[in-house]
A protein has these predicted regions:
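Extracytoplasmic gating/loop element in the C-terminal half of outer-membrane beta-barrel translocons
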Residues: 689-697, 871-950, 954, 989, ...
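Transmembrane beta-barrel wall of Gram-negative outer-membrane proteins
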Residues: 252, 282-325, 329-374, 391-419, ...
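Gram-negative outer-membrane beta-barrel transporters
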Residues: 731, 735-881
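C-terminal beta-signal and terminal closure region of outer-membrane beta-barrel proteins
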Residues: 967-1009
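Periplasm-facing N-terminal accessory domains of Gram-negative outer-membrane beta-barrel systems
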Residues: 2-142, 200, 214-216
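Solvent-exposed loop/turn elements at secondary-structure boundaries
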Residues: 156, 169, 436, 579-615, ...
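Periplasmic N-terminal accessory/gating domains of Gram-negative outer-membrane beta-barrel systems
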Residues: 66, 90-246, 265, 271-278, ...
Length: 1009
């Protein structure tokens, strides 16, 4: 079915959904309230009137109870409310200061007395700890937590670690080095879908979030790690819904400043690579300041809010002592080693919002947020020198206009128009050859520059909710039009030399760098010798995303709630379908098809966006005793992800008039260096340099072919949860939750033209490439490899979450989580993207099934705020995790596969290559080594000085990594045979700036009114 027919179907579906009076839904950026009205004998009261009033804006809504005494409000703004209930012949009851949180359904029951005497039910001003209708696995981060807990980078996503099962992961892309990267289900963070006021904030180029908001502008957010409702989609990982602050009838705001300096930091314990450490305290200075203000423009009608933050950071990263020593040996080759690499960063964030209340039934708001920053050397990880530096510029925007309409007391509509823009540039000031060595030591022009990503989206959403008796029907349509998405990515822009030995080992050889064969097999960073040339642009125009959902929240009995949902998601041109026919690899395979069944199977059809994205979801919650303090729940659902643009990117580049391609990628001993006639085994530094071909309109001999597999489909997870909630009292709750996630159709890149034994029983006869003869017969260039983007990856996650939460007990708020989990899969690395199997012929080999890179069996999280005497607050966050795995690898691939397979394939002890092909033995089990446990404690001590009833000055000191623990995590060297094998190479998550490497102190002040 072509895109026009799909668009027609989408429009027709929208009309059907919007015209139906029995199917309605709610947006994700709201809260709900429900309850039952009874008399003193517990008999239900029908037609009782319930009125809810927002205490900040004065906005009111009124409804009546049904014949079972039940009432419900949907599409409510999160905030503090008062609720009044009255019935014919009964008194009026009022609940004051009821807090409603995003994505939660609060329950407020009333028991009315006969007669006209009014009474007041006092309710604390915090959110109810138990959502009696909750069937998913979600956590709310409250306004108090955002304000009171320490934030190392003022990225509110750092608080998502308070959700059970969420762990920190390394940055998976150069554009995400300053983001809190969340590992959910053992994945690397790309599968997180973030919305702001219900509007898409997703990076469709590399996955994960795009924009960071001013922390002062965020009211609260909810993270759903598994089993979220049909309202949310486009994520096989977690869904995060963020809402911004609004103005109110009273002026309120803040002003703050935070200061850091090198003098407040402890020495970092830098890993030397041999099990010992050196100390270093690199230069550091940061100032972060800003504020917010909100209030009425016209009381009860028009409100405004504005927040601004500015960051000035003059920082640096300490070089690994091992890397510094090795790079100091090759200054004659152009290396510029330095004990520290400067990493300055400057940023502005702002948010503005206008809210207008037309009347009690209609309101609207406009929210606009922008972020702009520039930085230097943000890709440095402690193993690079100064020549491998870069600069980065970012400009981001997200906005929404939302209209809320109460059409009847039981029928609510919410319409949203959204906009998102992102422009990222990463480049360097020079171009020199890149030299790489084992363990990640490098110098020269960064292989990731230059690159540019641009994304422009327009979103149209309509969500409707209708309550009929015991049912609340929800439906909606979510349509995103992306007129432009793409940019350019010139990977491997200069000649790259990947040495199979460290500089110290090379210089110990009689001929030093003049020794032939030092590039054979390459290393874990590269293939040996390579370069790419051509037009690096990749552009997708008029991509679209359509989401439709229907859900029934059925209050089956007063004690049981059932959620029945169905969602449909469809992407249009997200896998580069419009470029496939022009892609030169596809065209070469078409030419070779008459001579090769393999080639014919690859072009028999073109890859298309998946069209069967139906995801059923069902959940139930049951109140065991009818008192709301013992709840059991369970559910099942399917969740489709997006295909982000980095997957088809290389294929799209090969559809340009002048294509961008790896001109050559030499790995094997017999590979000939172009233009020299010298095999790689005989080439050495000082030999004639290769001839670099000019950009071509066709693929060249030895280049890398890129293909989207004809059977490619969207990744999907099947998720199950079962849980129990025990409300110990009104201020304390315990929860236990088991979750199971099966991930299918994950991205895996397979070289279909890898070296294959002529006779597996006698590999001394040599190897051949399955497609080379067909290419020759077709008269087209013989490619070095054909790398097929498939959806053959699989992984599994099982976890048991135990959680204890306490609010206001002895002036303490506490969150304590423990997770016992196991994340396994087929060679699941930390990037969750373009995973190469170690043997392309056996992508699902038993020895390739093992722990995921982010597998952490035990994880403990504690967060608290204690209000001490004399206006002092103490707020710690503690995270501890067991050791994560890392992989044992060979110094060069022990299988004669050529390029296009996982680097450093290591045979099992005692196994030979011939034994492997005889299937007498196999490869070493994947990720079978473990690094070091993780421990981090951050804390804030604050002194509150009251300056009147509504004004407060808070003076504070924050400490990050309070115990000065060196967290190396699984950043260990797995290269067998090197002196550094089994020792840490650096800190966990080396390219991320969100985890403190040593004790870091910060002074600050915040004035609020």
């Amino acid at each position: 079915m072509n895109s026009k027919r799909w668009l027609c179907l989408a429009v027709m579906s929208c009309l059907v959904l919007l015209s139906s009076a029995s199917m309605f839904g709610q947006a994700t950026a709201n809260a709900s309230l429900q309850g039952t009205i009874t008399d003193r004998s517990q008999a239900v009261i029908g037609k009782a009137e319930v009125t809810i009033t927002n205490k900040e804006t004065g906005a009111t809504k009124t409804t009546t109870t049904n014949d079972t005494g039940g009432y419900r409000f949907d599409s409510l703004s999160a905030g503090i409310y008062s609720i009044k209930a009255t019935g014919p012949g009964f008194s009026t009851a009022e609940a004051k200061d009821v807090e409603l949180l995003i994505g939660r359904t609060a329950t407020q029951n009333f028991s009315l007395s006969p007669g006209g005497v009014s009474e007041t039910v006092e309710v604390t001003g915090t959110a109810p700890l138990v959502d009696q209708t909750k069937t998913d696995v979600s956590t709310n981060i409250t306004p108090e937590q955002i304000t009171e807990l320490p934030l190392i980078g003022r990225d509110i996503a750092d608080l998502a670690y308070l959700a059970p099962g969420v762990k920190a992961a390394d940055s998976y892309d150069p554009t995400k080095t300053r983001y809190a990267i969340l590992s959910v289900n053992g994945e690397g963070g790309r599968n997180i879908n973030v919305t702001v006021n219900g509007v898409d904030n997703k990076d469709n180029t590399v996955g994960g979030p795009v924009m960071q908001l001013p922390a002062e502008a965020v009211q609260e957010f909810q993270i759903s790690t598994q089993r979220f409702s049909a309202v949310n989609g486009r994520s096989a990982g977690a869904a995060i819904n963020v809402i911004t602050k609004s103005g109110s009838n009273n002026f309120h705001g803040s002003a703050f400043a935070f200061f850091r300096d090198q003098a407040f930091n402890a020495d970092q314990k830098l890993a030397n690579g041999d099990g010992t450490t050196s100390t270093g305290n690199p230069p550091y200075s940061r100032q972060w300041f800003g504020g917010s203000i909100g209030g009425p423009i016209k009381k009860d009608k028009l409100f405004a809010f504005f927040a601004f933050e500015r960051q000035r950071e003059h920082t640096s990263i300490a070089e690994s002592p091992t890397a510094l020593a090795e790079l100091s040996l090759v200054t004659s080759l152009g290396a510029q080693p330095s004990s520290t690499v400067p990493t300055p960063f400057f940023e502005n964030r702002l948010n503005g919002r206008l809210d207008y209340i037309f009347n009690s039934n209609n309101s609207a708001y406009l929210s606009v947020s922008t972020q702009a920053n520039n930085s230097t050397n943000d890709q440095s990880n402690g193993l690079f020198d100064l020549t491998e530096g870069n600069f980065t510029k970012n400009h981001l925007q997200v906005a929404n206009l939302t209209v809320n309409s109460t059409l009847t007391p039981t029928l609510i509509n919410q319409f949203t128009v959204g906009f998102q823009y992102w422009n990222n540039l990463i480049d360097s000031t020079g171009r020199t050859p890149l030299f790489t060595f084992p363990t990640g030591i490098e110098f020269g022009t960064n292989t990731n520059v230059p690159q540019n990503s641009i994304q422009r989206k327009y979103q149209f959403k309509d969500d409707i909710a209708k309550t009929i008796g015991k049912h609340t029907f929800k439906t909606g349509v979510d349509y995103i039009w992306t007129p432009f998405m793409g940019g350019f990515f010139e990977f491997n822009p200069t000649l790259e030399f990947d040495f199979n030995k460290l500089p110290s080992a090379i210089l110990a050889l009689p001929q030093g760098f003049n020794t032939p064969g030092l590039l054979v097999g390459g290393n874990v960073n590269g293939s040996g010798m390579s370069i790419a040339v051509g037009d690096p642009t990749f552009i997708i125009r008029d991509a679209k995303q359509l989401g439709l959902y229907f859900q029934d929240d059925w209050k089956m009995t007063s004690r049981m709630t059932v959620n029945l949902g169905l969602r449909y998601d469809k992407d249009f041109d997200f896998i580069g379908g419009s470029d496939i026919a022009q892609s030169r690899t596809f065209q070469e395979l078409q030419a070779a098809a008459p001579f090769s069944p393999l080639a014919a199977s690859l072009v028999a059809k073109k890859a298309t966006d998946y069209s069967k994205g139906f995801s059923p979801r069902v959940g139930l919650a049951y109140d065991l005793n009818g008192h709301g303090n013992h709840i059991v729940r369970a559910g099942f659902g399917m969740y489709f992800d997006n295909t982000f643009q980095n997957i088809p990117l290389f294929m799209e580049q090969q559809a340009n008039p002048t294509i961008f391609q790896t001109a050559f990628s030499l790995n094997g001993a017999s590979d000939v260096v172009p233009g020299t006639g010298i095999p790689l085994s005989a080439w050495h530094l000082g030999s004639p340099l290769p001839t670099i071909p000019a950009p071509q309109a066709a693929l060249t001999t030895g280049s890398i072919g890129r293909l989207m597999d004809p059977n490619y489909r969207t990744p999907v997870t099947e998720e199950f949860n079962g849980g129990y909630t025990w409300a110990i009292n009104s201020k304390s709750v315990f929860e236990a939750e088991y979750v199971h996630v099966l991930s299918l159709h994950e991205n895996k890149t397979i070289n279909l033209d890898a070296n294959t034994p002529i006779d597996p029983s006698n590999i001394s006869l040599g190897f051949f490439k399955p497609l080379s003869a067909a290419f020759t017969s077709a008269g087209v260039p013989v490619l070095g490899s054909v790398r097929d983007e498939t959806s053959g990856g699989r992984s599994r996650y099982d976890g048991m979450n135990l959680s204890f939460r306490q609010r206001g007990f002895h002036k303490m708020d506490l969150t304590l989580n423990y997770t016992l989990a196991r994340a396994v899969g087929y060679d699941v690395d930390g990037t969750s993207f373009r995973n190469y199997p170690r043997d392309p012929a056996r992508p699902l080999a038993p020895e390739d099934f093992g722990p995921a890179f982010n597998d952490e069996r035990h994880h403990l999280t504690l967060a608290a705020t204690t209000h001490l005497p004399w206006g002092i607050d103490f707020s710690p966050i503690l995270q501890a995790g067991s050791a994560r795995p890392y992989n044992a690898i060979a110094q060069s691939n022990q299988l004669s596969l050529g390029g296009g397979s996982a680097a450093g394939a290591l045979l099992a002890p005692g196994c030979t290559e011939q034994g492997y092909y005889n299937r007498a033995c196999g490869l070493n089990p994947i990720f079978n080594l473990r690094g070091a446990p993780y421990f981090d404690m951050d804390a804030r001590v604050a002194k509150n000085i009251k300056l009147g009833e509504h004004r407060n000055l808070q003076l504070m000191f924050q400490a990050f990594n309070l115990t000065n623990h060196a967290n190396y995590g699984n950043n260990f060297d797995g290269t067998v045979g090197l002196p550094s094998f089994g020792h840490p190479l650096g800190f966990i998550n080396p390219t991320s700036s969100t985890l403190p490497r040593a004790f870091t102190g910060e002074f600050g002040a915040r004035f609020s009114f």
